[in-house]
């Protein structure tokens, strides 16, 4: 039997809970003689890569968006809203499959030192939502017209382990990770007058540290890290592909041990990963793996992305040639679906707020071509619902996930309804 590591970690359900509650216990459970096949280790490495893909993607995106000294374009310091004043242009790639009916308001929060109070004004009957994403990418909460209504409100957003007094009249939103993304959307009908009205609302979206709530507060941007360790301009997927498997797993282990504790239901996966030396807060040492396994790790990023790409069918069901998404925003232990969304649709709304039926072929199975004209047909009385104060039910996107330009002659395109 081939040695795949010189360390033996107690595995199974008995290890899972201690790993989550106190990752430092891993080092206390190391002995010297676990053996197993190299193929076992390679499968674990593949599963671990997919498991961590949403976390690494979100962390890379966080740094690229927020490691800046001031607001500019689609970037802004931690703790400050980036308010987009008009519909996104056709070349916008900040999120996958954006819509052209709402104006975006995005902010990254650091909840490590203290909670943040998020406030919005009275929104009337205007459609809006503020989905909040953990570093692992699931939606933590989604204040908005559908869930909390249009009245002015304040929310206390707290990080892992916080315990304290929640101010009267506030609802606590508990983030499972130190960093959290708010990706707000506010409906606008496209006229200059309505853009101005929404822009005025955006100026009233406030983020204040709990210690400063109700007091005069002046925002100060946190210091910029001059060496984030990867490109600030390449697409996250390209950044991740450029990482070696050892670098990737070390980043994953560091994040799990600090900013992004694994979920309780991740226990069995943590126990498997520990068998090849991947554990929260512990260094991953590829040199301690068998040579065959180390060789397999060399092209793991490319192979794993191919596996994730092949897993797109996990996003939903096929109906009349369309893949109709199901269960986005809540992933549980479906790490493949979470990885697919991270790679090709980051970060995705809850299905109560958006469904993403998509196709790249016409009714006869031919690949969509931007040079052609197509008709999208709904049965009588079965068009997607919409209201005067809410967004259009249908947005077209290119295959790459951007908005579909009206004059596009792209050789391939995709349709999506959001």
Indicate where each model-derived feature is located.
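N-terminal secretory signal peptides and thylakoid transit peptides that target proteins
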Residues: 1-16
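A compositional/structural signature for long, glycine/proline-rich flexible linkers
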Residues: 29-418
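Hydrophobic core
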Residues: 18-20
